[in-house]
């Protein structure tokens, strides 16, 4: 039995809490929303009807983190810098379940956290895992990226179950970037579907988008093969093809003629791909990376006409297929 502190009582936070609860671990969730905290303490899952908690509690007191070794962070990426500086991370296992790039400074979560507390042990939990399906105990496979294999094996044992398979990977950068960048490509796929461009176009954007993700990853020392695993191709396929995906839905609404503001209002939840696209645009320009899909999503988010930008998504500039 492990004791795990969890920041973020959104869908992802409650989903993993549900899974950990089934495995008999004690979980304490942190959130600022008192109504959500109250529901959890009454044993009620705040987002999935019919699911009850046994060993999960919640608090609005962030200082209670000091009692726990294992910290899972499932906060929206842009919120993390404000929260993480308020806690003592010394001696912690920090497991990031958030997917994105910090817009203000273009940093990955691992970079931010390690700057605050260099000696903590950092992990990334990522892969194709829609919250509702995990909460219901449906079969899922994800990856845990690590810098300390001994601790990673302990966490793998704590998380793994018959219907929740956890693989290990020592490429933290690749797993982090895969989880973040696939949201941008999913917006592009949704846009294409919203404009009615068919399955050929969808398949092309997913495939070429994966190539762009791997190109960005390699620039930062990630292994290319990581992007063809669960945190890359696996998560990209799921997020790009299911209407449960907020990023795909956002893109689809843009393709149907909604403005950025209208689409975000209609979804009424965090769409991580929007801020990630803005951060990613700065990165691909700075590093001179050929990434027309990622660049196109940024241009559309900034107000350009999707019908004029879309043709550039698959513009090959007469390149070889696997040219970097």
Swiss-Prot record:
Reaction equations catalysed: sn-glycerol 3-phosphate + NAD(+) = dihydroxyacetone phosphate + NADH + H(+); sn-glycerol 3-phosphate + NADP(+) = dihydroxyacetone phosphate + NADPH + H(+)
Compartment(s) where it occurs, according to its Swiss-Prot or TrEMBL record: Cytoplasm
Binding site for sn-glycerol 3-phosphate: 99, 127, 129, 182, 235, 245-247
Active site: 182 (proton acceptor)
UniProt keyword annotation of NADP present: yes
Family indicated by similarity: Belongs to the NAD-dependent glycerol-3-phosphate dehydrogenase family.
Name under which the protein is recorded: Glycerol-3-phosphate dehydrogenase [NAD(P)+]
Species this chain originates from: Aquifex aeolicus (strain VF5)
Gene: gpsA
């Amino acid at each position: 039995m492990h004791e795990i502190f969890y920041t973020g009582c959104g869908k992802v936070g409650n989903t993993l809490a549900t899974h950990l609860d089934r495995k008999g671990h004690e979980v304490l969730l942190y959130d600022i929303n008192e109504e959500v905290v109250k529901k959890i303490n009454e044993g009620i899952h705040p987002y999935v009807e019919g699911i009850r908690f046994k060993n999960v509690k919640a608090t609005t007191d962030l200082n209670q983190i000091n009692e726990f070794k294992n910290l899972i962070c499932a906060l929206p990426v842009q919120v993390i810098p404000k929260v993480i500086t308020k806690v003592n991370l010394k001696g912690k296992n920090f497991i990031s379940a958030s997917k994105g790039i910090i817009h203000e400074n273009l940093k990955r979560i691992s970079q931010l956290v390690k700057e605050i507390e260099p000696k903590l042990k950092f992990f990334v939990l990522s892969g194709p895992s829609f919250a509702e399906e995990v909460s219901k105990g449906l079969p899922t496979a994800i990856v845990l990226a690590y810098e300390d294999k001994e601790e990673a094996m302990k966490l793998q044992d704590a998380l793994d179950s018959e219907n929740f398979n956890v693989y290990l990977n020592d490429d933290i950068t690749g797993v982090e970037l895969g989880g973040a960048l696939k949201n941008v490509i999913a917006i592009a796929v949704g846009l294409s579907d919203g404009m009615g461009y068919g399955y050929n176009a969808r398949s092309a954007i997913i495939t070429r988008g994966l190539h762009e993700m791997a190109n960005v990853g390699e620039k930062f020392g990630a292994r290319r093969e990581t992007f063809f695993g669960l945190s890359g191709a696996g998560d990209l396929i799921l997020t790009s093809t299911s209407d449960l995906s907020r990023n795909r839905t956002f893109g689809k609404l843009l393709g149907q003629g909604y403005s950025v503001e209208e689409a975000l209002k209609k979804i009424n939840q965090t769409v991580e791909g929007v801020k990630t696209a803005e951060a990613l645009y700065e990165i691909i320009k700075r590093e001179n990376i050929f990434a027309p899909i990622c660049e196109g999503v940024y241009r559309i988010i900034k107000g350009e006409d999707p019908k004029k930008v879309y043709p550039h998504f698959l513009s090959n500039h007469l390149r070889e297929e696997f040219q970097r």
